[in-house]
Amino acid sequence: MAIRNIVYSDNEFIRKQSKKVVNFNESLWELLDDMKETMHKANGCGLAAVQVGVLKQAIIVEVNNLFLELINPEILEEIGEQCEVEGCLSVKNISGYVKRPKQITVKACDRYGNEFVITGTGYLACALSHEIDHTKGILFIDKMEREYKPKKKGSN
């Protein structure tokens, strides 16, 4: 496993559409392992392959001790709406309020090509939606309602 360099929002590569994964092999497994290590090193909760310079529809998400790898993720259903503060490992020094589904159902494959369906709510729904957007070249700042500015300590 290796830590990979993160592609930032000032690099036009991050806006490219990712391609479907067709080969579920050691190359993909190594990418997924590297993505997990890179995400942990950067203290993130999700990462898309495009964020480490690979145009493959592969994302990882880790929320509430649940670690997921989703290959070729496809949103089947979105229910409700929530507006929460988001950040991104590819977008430096900006956080903002983004509307996302309250519940999301996604079809994807695991690292071996086995198809599965998962439904996530709350923070998991946000994370899945955010990472799937990356596969389409969309960043959270494209959907941001307004920037989040934390209050400074000692201010009322």
Features from the language model and the residues they span:
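Positively charged
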Residues: 1-156
